[in-house]
Amino acid sequence: MSFTETLQSITGKLLADCTDQELYLALLELVRQKSADRVQPVTGRKLYYISAEFLIGKLLSNNLINLGLYDEARSALAAAGKRLSDIEEVEPEPSLGNGGLGRLAACFLDSLATLGLPGDGVGLRYHFGLFHQSFEDGVQNEKPDPWLTAHSWAEKTDITYPVQLAGKQYTARLYKLAVTGYEGRTNTLNLFDLDTIDESIVHDGIAFDKTAIDKNLTLFLYPDDSDEAGRRLRVYQQYLMVSAGAQLILAECAARGCNYHDLADYAAIQINDTHPSMVIPELIRLLGERGIKFEEAVEIVTKTCAYTNHTILAEALEKWPRAYLDAVVPQLMPIIEKLDALARTRTEDESLAIIDKDDRVHMAHMDIHFTHSTNGVAALHTEILKNSELHGFYELYPEKFNNKTNGITFRRWLLECDPRLTATLEKHIGSGFRKDAAELEKLLAFADDETVLNELTAVKKANKEALADWLLHTQKVQVNTDAVFDIQSKRLHEYKRQQLNLLYLIHQYYEIKAGHLPAAPLVSIFGAKAAPAYTIAKDIIHALLTLSRVIAADPEVSKWLQVVFVENYNVTAAEKLIPACDLSEQISLASKEASGTGNMKFMLNGALTLGTMDGANVEISQQVGEENIYIFGQTSDQVIHRYAVGDYDPAQWVEGDANIRRAINFLTGPEMLAAGHAENLTRLHDELIHKDWFQTLPDFNAYVVRKGQALSDYACAPLDWRRKCLVNIAKAGMFSSDRTIAEYDRDIWHLGK
């Protein structure tokens, strides 16, 4: 049966007579059928990757590519007068993640399946995700981001597990979402939910009764934790995920012949950040119910579980008040107390305890003590963990610490989102890079070939024009495609320093007004959501939106400078922005970004990086050479020293530097106040002068100079710029998540063995 006949058998009508919605549902069903054919029996050890978020993005095109059906689908639809791109628009984007943590988890699932490794995800089936972002009067507003429909990729099962929360029993329902690998196997993303969730309790944006657990538990990812009810709700969520997940793991292993004593021969459990940490005491509890004594259960769980640390920020290393756990998961507290006592027999260092003197339970500490592996996610990050942030643990367990530099799936971030570049690469180096990213290095042979360099430039220009069309259609913004597209798209956080970019743009505004024109016009594009309770982050968004209005209203400046803030940034938006980017902003304060993966996506698509020596920027710099990246700012050692000495006073920088003073004072100047809100702008102004915890001001002048150099190179040395872009593409192979997953398997999981 031909592809067309198969689709018509599903729809019951000719393709030309189908609506886009009908064709989407038919393709969804076809993908399910084909995915089921690739499910393979599990032998030996299987991975369970537990994560609070999986930012999987839309799945239709990705699945068609991985199943080898994309070109056939596009041709069959075109023959019927239909466009696959129109059908893709029908698909809602799953609201299951927020930022890099969730996107990494999604990339890892893709690579596991592509490499033929048995590995499933475990998470929650959020109804509204983080939130849907909109801008009203220059201010971020939040509302639900619904995606669940009667026909969803996540299929409801009859499998349920009891979960005890605060003395009450809830029933966790399992939903299964097929994960297809590129020419590989099909694995599963297991998502848990409650049948009792009531979406109608949400009101006034994303407000809801945080105490109605049976109705609210999986409504939102990371519910607002600005009050105690919200913080407790996060504990409820985390326990639902790990309790149901642990029961699923034990059930699947038992069905394969596991007697629980040998669990580590059947399962490898990866704890992705600290959100799933309670799986450790929960597994010990469940093994105890199955007749295994505490000491042996601890040994089994330690052999089975491994932990990935994703942060250097102390605020993100979860520490729950004991009172919360006593109230929500009283069945775990006796086990956590015993684990704390056991940890104290290994060290007298109070700072390494699980339960501290203030009765807070440190999740990361429990993870490190009672897993067999703790890994960082970039070489610099891991060294900082070993030498600074987790030094005491490293001295206690040096054999547990290892690095696994993050990666991205090239299927989504090249094949799917940049088909023009994919076709150009295949024309010159073949298609081997689809599964072996190292093959991209073959492109280096064309570094001095002007024909190839011009082809890459044409690809970038076409991608910029496509982005311009998308921005006009979705954001109602018109941009100059001859300008440098300078993009900073990532979660809004002070350590990622969107505020540094803001001050640069103000500086450029003044320079243009003074007649000092840049080497090239600049379109500065942002995409970011700020946590609803993160006031300063929302103030930064307001300042950027206000500045955008000020510049747009100034004909003298707007010819050279434009600021665009993409509303509701998500995977779909990223797939538009990344292929069109010229200059990739990776400007976090050195020592604060664990890795980053946006830097890798932009690099792969031929953008040049403007960044600090932080996270994976360090390894990108090593790969491409310092002449093919724009590095600026303090080193991590300098930053750590400045924190240790504690002598940083931003007010002194403001007083001593006219450019810094001018840029900061502009925030509360007449132009901004006329277009924005004094409360937001004044608060950000004062924050930068009196606090500036992430050291924006010491890096400001170096940033201005380095960015100016990048713009000059783009405008004045176009051939060299193109060559730099080629080198970045060619050297991106190291940052494939296939490489990352192969290293995890080699060193930590040993799957299928």
Model regions and ranges:
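A conserved ligand/cofactor-binding region detector
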Residues: 1-753
